[in-house]
């Protein structure tokens, strides 16, 4: 099972790179597997064999991180709990779109999926405005169209006012009868808008709380994250530019901390941001990482000073 997921992850990386996306290295034990970026598109991807294995909490965290990083969450999967996923169909897991690798590939090549799965079957989004205009121009009554499509007059009214979407069969009958294309493609890169970003500081160790409070005092807006390779994301608007700071906060340094911080440094470059490792006890200077102690952080005056300090550390690295 794991091997199948690993293969799917490599295929996704290859596909995204072939479409000129910059892709992060795959992640372990995180609510997302990779970040892919191209121009103004930013995807936060989760790769799963069974899309129903994503829990409500995991999906909440995936949506939260996507919102903080100004990206779109997307799941690439193989099956649902009950059956293999259909090609060309968009599934939904707690308001995150999920598609097969083949559907994703078609989308990147310019053929968006038209069908989405919901309780009760497969549905399509149609252009209700065009439906109404064409029906009226052809002098066809709501009753007549309802009869042809095998639905109620109320259903036709709902399609025309975009209050409901028809099943695939009903849409085909309507399109055939009116001889006009009505079905709209589904945008996989549309941002998900339903997540209020909760900031839970109460479960954090004291030194982490302290570090985040100092970042906020410097003028950053900081968000705590779980199930990610970083502990917090700090943001600051400066010179009409959003500075994103991926932050790891640790008690002291060890190999695992360093490995994670190096990974986050690479990820921050992909996001045109910065990374920072904040240590409660900093025992030495670091050659290849922006690192500060909580004491050093306390001495800074504002966000600009910290960003400039990180830039100078990065110049030393290079």
Swiss-Prot record:
Keywords: DNA-binding, Transcription, Transcription regulation. SMART domains: HTH_XRE. The keyword DNA-binding applies. CDD domains: HTH_XRE. It comes from the Archaea. Gene3D superfamilies: lambda repressor-like DNA-binding domains. The keyword Lyase does not apply. This is Putative HTH-type transcriptional regulatory protein MJ1164. Residues 131-189 form the HTH cro/C1-type domain. GO terms for molecular function: DNA binding; DNA-binding transcription factor activity. Residues 142-161 bind DNA. It holds the Pfam family HTH_3. InterPro entries: Arc_TR_HTH, Cro/C1-type_HTH, Lambda_DNA-bd_dom_sf.
């Amino acid at each position: 099972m794991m091997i199948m997921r690993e293969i799917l992850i490599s295929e996704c990386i290859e596909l995204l790179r072939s479409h000129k996306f910059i892709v992060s290295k795959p992640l372990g034990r995180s609510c997302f597997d990779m970040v892919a970026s191209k121009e103004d598109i930013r995807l936060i991807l989760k790769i799963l064999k069974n899309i129903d294995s994503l829990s409500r909490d995991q999906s909440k965290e995936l949506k939260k991180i996507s919102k903080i990083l100004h990206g779109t969450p997307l799941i690439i999967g193989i099956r649902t709990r009950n059956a293999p996923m259909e090609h060309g169909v968009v599934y939904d897991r707690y308001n995150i779109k999920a598609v097969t690798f083949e559907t994703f590939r078609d989308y990147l090549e310019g053929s968006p999926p038209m069908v989405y799965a919901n309780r009760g079957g497969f549905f399509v989004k149609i252009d209700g405005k065009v439906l109404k205009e064409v029906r009226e121009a052809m002098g066809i009554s709501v009753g007549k169209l309802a009869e042809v499509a095998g639905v109620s007059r109320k259903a036709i009214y709902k399609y025309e006012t975009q209050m409901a979407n028809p099943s695939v069969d009903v849409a085909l009958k309507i399109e055939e009868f009116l001889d006009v294309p009505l079905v709209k493609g589904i945008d996989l890169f549309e941002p998900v808008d339903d997540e209020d970003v909760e900031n839970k500081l109460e479960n954090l160790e004291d030194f982490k709380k302290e570090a985040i409070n100092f970042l906020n005092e410097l003028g950053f807006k900081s968000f705590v994250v779980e199930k990610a390779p970083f502990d917090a994301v700090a943001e600051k608007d400066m010179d009409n530019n959003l500075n994103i700071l991926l932050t790891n906060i640790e008690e002291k340094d060890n190999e695992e901390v360093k490995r994670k911080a190096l990974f986050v440094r690479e990820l921050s470059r992909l996001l045109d941001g910065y990374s920072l490792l904040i240590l409660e006890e900093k025992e030495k200077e670091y050659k290849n990482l922006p690192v500060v102690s909580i004491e050093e952080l306390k001495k800074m005056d504002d966000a600009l000073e910290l960003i400039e300090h990180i830039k100078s550390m990065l110049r030393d690295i290079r």
